[in-house]
């Protein structure tokens, strides 16, 4: 490998600004902020959305398309739901 061409990959702490959740990960992103985390000092990266606050990971996701293909077919042709009748 060539020297001095690779980015500086190091452990950094990511802070979810929405929830205050912190987690340690590796990154090449540079920052001037630092934070104390688990007894060590690490660079701090602030993020607006992480797995702690994103609706997909928290289970608070709203689905915009609630009807499936079968439901649309039944509505189009005026058929009743076979499962609801039982």
Swiss-Prot record:
GO terms for cellular component: ribonucleoprotein complex; ribosome. SUPFAM superfamilies: L28p-like. GO terms for molecular function: structural constituent of ribosome. Keywords: Ribonucleoprotein, Ribosomal protein. It comes from the Bacteria. InterPro entries: Ribosomal_bL28/bL31-like_sf (IPR034704), Ribosomal_bL31 (IPR002150), Ribosomal_bL31_B (IPR027493), Ribosomal_bL31_sf (IPR042105). Signal peptide: none annotated. It holds the Pfam family Ribosomal_L31. One of its GO terms (biological process) is translation. NCBIfam families: L31 (TIGR00105), PRK01678.1 (NF002462). Part of the 50S ribosomal subunit. Belongs to the bacterial ribosomal protein bL31 family. Type B subfamily. This is Large ribosomal subunit protein bL31B. The gene is rpmE2.
């Amino acid at each position: 490998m060539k020297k001095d061409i690779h980015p500086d990959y190091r452990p950094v702490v990511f802070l979810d600004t929405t929830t205050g959740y912190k987690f340690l990960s590796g990154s090449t992103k540079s920052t001037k902020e630092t934070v104390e985390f688990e007894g060590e000092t690490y660079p701090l990266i602030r993020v607006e959305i992480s797995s702690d606050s994103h609706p997909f990971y928290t289970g608070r996701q709203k689905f915009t398309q609630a009807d499936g293909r079968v439901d649309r077919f039944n509505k189009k042709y005026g058929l009743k739901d076979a499962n609801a009748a039982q």
